Amino acid sequence: MEFTKSLVKGKLIKRYKRFFTDVKLGKEVVTAHCPNTGSMKGLLDEGNDVYLLPNNDPKRKLKYGLEIIKTRKNLVGVNTHMANRIAQHALENNLIKELKNSDLIKPEVFFNKETRFDFLIEKNKQKSFVEVKNVTLFRNKDTAEFPDAVTSRGTKHLLTLIDAIKKGYKSYLLFLVQIQNMEKFKIAKDIDNEYYNNYLKAKKAGVNFLAYRCDISSKKIFIDKKLKIIDD
């Protein structure tokens, strides 16, 4: 996925009220929209390099959106709205080995009245649901982790993926690691032990878990490598 415009580099001052980020651009301080309402654990140190996407829409008050943060020498894609676009690009271009050559790729499909999964795919008449989780947490140099905060919604998705298997679907959960240089992935059970336990339950029930790393630059983000999932 290529960015629609060239990104502008600045220095992070602070993020506040979940949706706002103050950034120093040269001698000017601007407020950018933060398209990530999560904890963004480990990413928000003052002085970190950030990359903003300019916005010329007169209807929008904020003229920049936060896309990338550089921390501990790694670029991290923080726009959660990009995750599904990156995943769809990967599905359509056969970048995910386990999901190659699908006959149908349909985004945002309801499984029941309460739950909508990110994708429904079909291959050889077998239908599969795919849920995508954006990953931005890393606490050592080569291991990405999820979640970065307690996620009841994430736990609900795990249990619903199990329900989908019982109704004849295949279920996949794709951890989309928007962090440079990662080689492994694991569940952050110290952050959300309930999620970890339900992850193990879902794995035993037949949910397929995948972790893929993105190649990130100020011009584009795309899936480039499968990561090993570690179960502690």
What residue ranges belong to the model's regions?
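Flexible glycine-rich surface loops and low-complexity tracts that mediate binding to linear polymers
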Residues: 48-57, 213-214
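Short aromatic-glycine-enriched beta-strand elements
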Residues: 17-22
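Acidic-basic catalytic patches of nuclease active cores, encompassing PD-(D/E)XK
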Residues: 41, 74-106
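OB-fold/S1-family single-stranded nucleic acid-binding modules
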Residues: 57-74, 224
